[in-house]
Amino acid sequence: LPGGKETSYKMIVIGDPQVTNAYSPYYTSPDDNPIKKSDVERFTTQTMADIKQTIRSLPAGTPVYGLSMGDDVQYYGGYNAKLERQIRQALGSSEMRLFSVIGNHDQDGKALYRRKWEENFGPTDFSFNRGDVHYVCINNCFFHHGMAYYSPGELRERQVKWLRQDLALTPKDMKVVLCYHIPFTFGNA
């Protein structure tokens, strides 16, 4: 990332793309006939096209960052290296620098999936500063006994220790934004 303190930037937040290697009907207007498009094609031609248009609408030189809030992919039938490559290419096809939080569908309770995600996107727990904001991105999706993830989200003791150390080094005048995939509470609690 560029050095120095930015006083103004834009953060585009992407929620739950869940791009799959499956095919589904998508419509672009009520008059369209249903056509089959892959999720990757839909994400590239619709979602990323909208993001690129948003970036073009900003004043020239505005720093732009993206933050995917997890579930970049949805695996059906096991890990899919081609799908990972395609979503990385799609997400990297604009001028924005992208950060990504891991979601439950990015790992599906499999150590292999989590390792592959880390190889492709980086660590599952990290932080960065932009302007006067300290962003903390953390994995809060854990699977129990290889089964479905537990909701609400939770943190492991090692993460709490890391978070305390991270925040201790953060200037007290900075805002802190905690980024994670699933809610930490049930309902209205």
Predicted regions mapped to residue ranges:
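N-terminal active-site segment of His-dependent metallophosphoesterases
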Residues: L1-N80
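Active-site neighborhood of phospho(di)ester-bond hydrolases with catalytic His/Asp-centered motifs
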Residues: V13-G15, Y65-D71, R97-N104, I138, ...
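Short, solvent-exposed loop/turn segments at secondary-structure junctions
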Residues: P17-V19, V73, D106-Q107, C141-F143, ...
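His/acidic metal-ligating clusters that form di-metal
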Residues: F43-G66, G92-R97, H134, A148-A189
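Extended active-site neighborhood of metal-dependent phosphoesterases/phosphodiesterases
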Residues: S24, S29-K37, Y75-K172
